[in-house]
Regions:
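Basic, low-complexity terminal or inter-domain segments flanking catalytic cores
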Residues: 2-13, 27-333
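Eukaryotic nuclear/nucleolar intrinsically disordered, charge-dense low-complexity regions
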Residues: 21-24
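Single conserved hydrophobic/aromatic residue that forms the stacking wall/gate
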Residues: 332, 338-341
Length: 341
């Protein structure tokens, strides 16, 4: 969304097209890992990418190094973390269809290929430096890092994106830092004062909102409940974009088509206020986690299906009646004539 300014639903349509043209594997998946069966044949996928010019050299490099042969023993392969389908990867086939792809679709395909090939290259290495300097009783702190080895970063950099510039430091400066010891006296060449202000959190765009929905458990303080919802989140990979689309259709949020920035509408804020002051728990991810825990209890026989259903029915009835009793008056508000459910 941030890179191409397209919505999650448009992204899914593009990846669906790539799938139908046999360029990538099944797109409607939450998985971030591969299956053991796929790992055994992964060399075919890599070898096929030698026919895709933007990543041909990196595919050849992965084949030459042979790192793919041990992929089954890495964190990228885990059958237990796969429910229906493994992660989206390029098939290494279907290149005849590349000519029929729109420019954006071709770029999305390149991203998938580069992300896939990156796992067969070493990690990027940085050197972190933290210094505490003392002068006349005042302490000054300096923290920075510099790149030692690019590793996979040279593979993941897209051909169509501006490369992120890493801070440049002279070799002399780096060598001098390596020799600095506690208690050393350093001469100050210059001092520069910079003034700044803290910035508010950035607004969600459609892409970052999808990721937040996927990782909703991060907002839960209770460790047991946080673990309960881990890997679940709000919705699924096949429904999250639909949830956002429905919120927009109901006029609860506004989605800027050019920037993909998501903004709550006046109606959306009203709905939020009503829920906040009546059923506050619905706004918290730990409620969803507790429901998931209850469902797990049913599955494990710790609680009967009837008992769980009764608890849910009582909860919904109680708080629905509470909402009905709230006196609310908003003027100058035009409500949508039809809400999607």
């Amino acid at each position: 969304s941030a890179l191409f300014k397209i919505s999650p639903s448009d992204t899914l349509k593009i990846v669906q097209e790539l799938y139908e043209k046999k360029l990538v594997t099944y797109p409607r998946t939450d998985a971030r890992v591969l299956s053991t069966a796929v790992a055994k044949e992964i060399g075919r996928n890599i070898s096929g990418l030698k026919n895709f010019q933007p990543v041909a050299a990196w595919a050849q490099g992965a084949m030459d190094s042979g790192t793919y042969k041990g992929i089954a023993k890495t964190k990228y392969v885990n059958d237990k973390q796969i429910t229906d389908h493994y992660a989206i990867i390029p098939t290494g086939q279907g290149f005849g269809a590349l000519k029929s792809l729109a420019p954006t679709a071709l770029k999305v395909y390149e991203i998938i290929c580069r992300r896939f090939l990156s796992i067969f290259y070493p990690a990027a290495e940085y050197q972190k430096v933290a210094m505490t300097l003392t002068k006349n009783g005042e302490k000054l702190f300096a923290n920075f890092k510099y790149l030692i080895s690019e590793g996979y970063l040279k593979v993941s950099a897209n051909s169509f994106s501006k490369k992120k510039d890493e801070p440049k430091y002279s070799q002399e400066f780096i060598e001098r830092l390596a020799n600095v010891k506690k208690g050393d006296k350093l001469s100050v060449q210059s001092i520069e004062i910079k003034e700044g202000e803290t910035s508010p959190p950035k607004r969600y765009n459609s892409g970052s909102l999808i990721l937040t929905m996927e990782n909703a458990g991060q907002f839960i303080e209770d460790e047991d409940l946080r673990e309960q919802i881990k890997g679940a989140g709000i919705g699924t990979s096949a429904t999250r974009d639909g949830i956002i689309t429905k919120l927009e259709a109901n006029k609860y949020i506004s989605l800027n088509k050019k920037t993909q920035i998501v903004t709550p509408t006046f109606l959306g804020e009203i709905i939020y206020d009503i829920v906040y002051y009546s059923i506050n728990g619905l706004l918290r991810a730990d409620l969803t986690a507790s429901w998931e825990k209850g469902l797990e209890g049913v599955a494990e026989g710790q609680i009967s299906k009837e008992e769980y259903t009764q608890k849910m029915t009582t909860y919904v009835t109680q708080y629905t009646n509470r909402v009905k009793q709230i006196p609310v008056s908003y003027t100058h508000l035009t409500l949508p004539t039809k809400l999607e459910v």
